[in-house]
């Protein structure tokens, strides 16, 4: 099968600079990387083709040979001898890691494989507002992978140990060559571990870990809110064959409260008052998380008026300064009136009639005046 021109593969001209070649490689490597194209069987081959073109065209000596002899310079028996450029090329993952850093979690470095760290775990915890504000302790049960006790997490039967894999010599990877392609992959003998367990533990069957449900006591600091996350270091799944354990992340969700709404460190609540208290003034009891307090209601208070009670909110988990309680007064209209009460209200209403009526109901008069002007403008 004929091979594509390397310049065509990268989409650059034959006089392209090394910078242009590297830029094209980054774009195409991200486009065709197998991790981003799972299920696309053509992606790995396209990625390898891009990588080979990059390796050749960024090496001055190899590029000169390619410009003069084309693909023949790197074929068996061609320029450069058997094996072509294979002896001088780097790891498939190394070059990708050098160019992209940790975009895909870091390059696949060569060298001895280490046992993998345990996975992190997540637990969703629901709290009442009072628990979140004051702090509390909760016992939780977590299904996890724990280190096997009989073998101390090694995977080998007690009194025995693992041996270095003879296929990869402990590297965990082997290099496969296809023509001028050289690709590293997990060792098929040890499955990338670098070690072989000849006499596995009967409890964990060589894995070094067993399924277990463990109980933890979680201390919730005061002031947490929905979306906060508490990290418990080392309480995730056990690592492979003695590697460090992962972490446990407790995700906090605060349930809705029947009185208070929370916004940051401030609390909000609505308090109903009678229309007589709103008109004449007085005192009303207001609930707080620390008990009841009195709020003075000024004369002629309108419904919806808000009052700020400083320091009666939530003490923040990070700031340690308390927010405020914002109280919204709602003026209630009396219901189920007696005949006498209706008569009194009628007399009260009639007392507003006359030339002074406007001053008693400034909002109503302002609204009616606005409506009149609106319709007057429509008829002009």
Curated annotation (Swiss-Prot):
Subcellular location: Cytoplasm
Cofactor note: Binds 2 Zn(2+) ions per monomer.
ZnF region ranges: CR-type: 135-213
Residue span, J domain: 5-70
GO BP, one annotated term: protein refolding
SMART domains: DnaJ (SM00271)
Repeat positions for CXXCXGXG motif: 148-155, 165-172, 187-194, 201-208
Pfam families in the cross-refs: DnaJ, DnaJ_C, DnaJ_CXXCXGXG
InterPro entries, A to Z: DnaJ (IPR012724), DnaJ_C (IPR002939), DnaJ_domain (IPR001623), DnaJ_domain_CS (IPR018253), HSP40/DnaJ_pept-bd (IPR008971), HSP_DnaJ_Cys-rich_dom (IPR001305), HSP_DnaJ_Cys-rich_dom_sf (IPR036410), J_dom_sf (IPR036869)
Binding site for Zn(2+) 1: 148, 151, 201, 204
GO molecular function terms attached to this record: ATP binding; heat shock protein binding; unfolded protein binding; zinc ion binding
Record note on quaternary structure: Homodimer.
HAMAP family: DnaJ
Family: Belongs to the DnaJ family.
Name by which UniProt lists this protein: Chaperone protein DnaJ
Gene behind the chain: dnaJ
